[in-house]
Amino acid sequence: MKKTLMLQERKKSFPIRRSTFHHSTNTQISMSPQRKTPKIKIGWFTFSCCEDNTVVMTEVMNDHWQEWKELFDFRYARALQSKNVIDEFDIAFIEGAVTSENHGEKLKEIRAKSKKLVAVGACAVIGMPAGQRNAYKKKQKDEIEFLLTRFASLPKVLKVSDVVKVDAEVPGCPMDPNQFLEVVNRVVGELKKEAASKKL
């Protein structure tokens, strides 16, 4: 009885440690979690437009949600979430034309923080139909002058490429979902290729 109690006390003092070696190969198993590939940081920004491209984007996202949730980190997308940040983006998507000084300043800030910038939709790509006032006659311009002053509008509506460098474009009003997906895949491929070349 006394010997049994001594053995029990010894087991408490020296607990059995499980081996981290695989029995068949005698190779140590790593206990640390595998590193995941960093997600691609996305920003989705809207300027002067009807936002129909945002609708198309969300429809495409619904169809590709299972793959996109593993691939993308939406850092800024007000149509999708309430918490948004402007820090660093791998891809910034811009819809809408540039109609004010504030738009221009914000667009330049986004460009400076983005590896790739994609203009989506007609207003962003060609400045229309948001830029119809560019073709107004003097009388029409005089009639809307008070509105331009109130909203600190630019004298002329600009497309995105008038203000910053654009890496890719998806035209249309609204944009074609298949063409949008094609551009997304192409730009993602370019980013992956650039990342791989840096590792060499």
Which residues are covered by each model-predicted region?
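Low-complexity, intrinsically disordered or signal/transmembrane-proximal segments
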Residues: 8, 22-23, 28, 34
